Amino acid sequence: LNQMKKNKIEHYSDKEALEFHNSNKSGKIEIISSKPMTTKRDLALAYSPGVAAPVKAISQDPDLAYDYTTKGNLVAVISNGSAILGLGNLGAIASKPVMEGKAVLFKRFADIDSIDLEIDSNDPEEIINSIKNFSKSFGGINLEDIAAPDCFIIEKKLKKILDIPVFHDDQHGTAIITTAALINAIHITKRDIKKIKIVINGAGASAMACADLFKSKGVPQKNITMLDRQGVIYKGRKGLNDWKSLHAIETKSRSLNEAIKGADVFLGLSKAGILKKEMVKKMSKNPIIFAC
C-alpha cells in the first residue's frame, strides 16, 4: 500500500496531450530500416535487383517469409473505432491515436513491430474480408476497440480462417490482467473463489471475457451478476442477444443498487462514477473493487 501511495497516477491536460502527439514528427510511430542503407550496394540488395532472390524463394515456400521479411515479428493493430475505450463510437480515423499507442507499447515492452490499420466499416463481414486479404503480411492480428457483438463475430471467424494468431485485446487482455488481480485479491482477503459474489457493471466484450475467465477459474456462474444499460441481465429478460443470454442468471435483482448488496467484488467496465459510496457500504467486508 505504501508503494502504491508513492506511485501516484499523474494527470495531464488535453493541451499537454495534444502537444505530445504533435511535437517533432506528428503521431507516435515511424518506420526505420533494420539493414544498413549507406551504399549503392546496400540499396541494390534492399530493393532491385537484390529482392529477386527472396521473392523467388518465398514463391516456392511461403513460410520463408518468416526468414526473409518482417512477418514473424509484425502485428497488425486493427480497429474500426466503434468502441473506443471511454469514448464510444467515434469512427475509424479517430481511433488512430489509440492504435498508434498500442503499436508503441508492443515495441517498448516486447520489441514487436506493429502497424495500425483503421478500417472504415461497421460491417463485420467487410472487416473480416479486409483482414483476410492483407493477413499474409503479418505474423499476428490484434483487434481493438470494436463494438460488441461485432467483435465476437469478427474474432471467431478470423480464428477459423487465418493461420496466424488473432488476439482481441478488449476481451482477452482485460480478462487476463483482471483475473490475475482477482486471484491476488482473493488470496489477500482470504476468500474462497467458489463462494465469492461478483457484480460486473457493463456487458461489452471485456465484461463477457472477464466473466468467462472468472468461471474457468472456479467462480460459479450463478455468483456473477452482469448489468448493461437496461439493468441486470437475468434469465427471462426480453431482448437479450445470444452473447448476453449466456451470462443471464436467476436473480430477483434488477438494478446495480440491488445487485451490489452483499457482493464481494465489483468490476466496473462501463463508464466512470457508477459505483457510489452508499453502494460500497452495502458490499461485504473488505470488498474488492476494480473501477475508475
Give residue spans per PLM region:
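N-terminal ligand-binding/catalytic initiation module
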Residues: M4-V166
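Structured core elements
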Residues: A76, D116-E118, N142, V199-I200, ...
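A generic local secondary-structure boundary/capping motif
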Residues: D63-Y68, I131, I188-T189, L213-S216, ...
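Glycine-rich phosphate/diphosphate-binding loop of Rossmann-like nucleotide-binding domains
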Residues: L85, A92-A110, L162, H168, ...
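ADP-ribose/adenylate-binding Rossmann-like module
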Residues: N142-D145, D169, L267-C292
